[in-house]
């Protein structure tokens, strides 16, 4: 979860998963610290001094001071030079007074712990296939225990990647169907210890109540570079209007439909020679590329939320 979405300090379990290192009893040596706070002199010095005192070597550090908002953002990737003596909990508890001094919203993540991701789909499989392929190729370090679909169409695709599939139908004629489906989703998030929900062309609108329960933990992909063309067949509408750019946006889901903080956007230039089918194919590529980047950056703790905006440390 991005730091600003956490509402304060994350607990050791919530921020890094398994306190003390990787599974199997082996002490992990690498951690990612993310933080945001009101900007002032001395933040970088205080963070660096603490990490040095804790026996950590900085592998990568990025920071950004937003002069307009007066906010400071930082991501530090470190390795512990004494992993058997300094555990995750040690690093976490030792940083608490530093964070308190500067009023930080922060998280500490164990890089050995892969985020657990639940993917939700409808009938289009291009984004799901791309995410599961990248996962299998280890280009995307996430753990996907389950795919959920409001239609059963993609069960075979999930099975081909060795991932379980659950059909959670929604009947538009039944007013209680959608609330039941969202209740099941929340149960799965809890039962499977899900860190992130990805809407990989899931064609249902989530309720404001559900969005409020998972702030900063749901990523959606849609053709938002076609904002003038609402509803069905947006690429056919775009073709009729002669658009020159099409694309897709990956964003966090909020109660405001398709208006959550943007993580990534992918665009492609097109011209009059492209058919509606061409535009749809190009759009599908843009969707899978933007979504994969957004999920990877979230999984690598590169996204920091600040209101309706995001800071991305690539």
Which stretches of residues belong to each language-model region?
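Intrinsically disordered, low-complexity terminal tails and inter-domain linkers enriched
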Residues: 1-28
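Short N-terminal helix-initiation segments at or just after the protein's N-terminus
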Residues: 1-3, 56-57, 61-62, 91-93
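Compositionally biased, intrinsically disordered low-complexity segments enriched
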Residues: 11, 20, 28, 64-65, ...
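Solvent-exposed loop and beta-edge segments used for protein-protein assembly and interaction
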Residues: 27, 53, 68-70
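Short glycine-/aliphatic-rich beta-strand segments at the starts of folded cytosolic domains
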Residues: 27-38
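Short amphipathic alpha-helix segments
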Residues: 40-60
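One-carbon transfer enzymes
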Residues: 65-71, 75-314
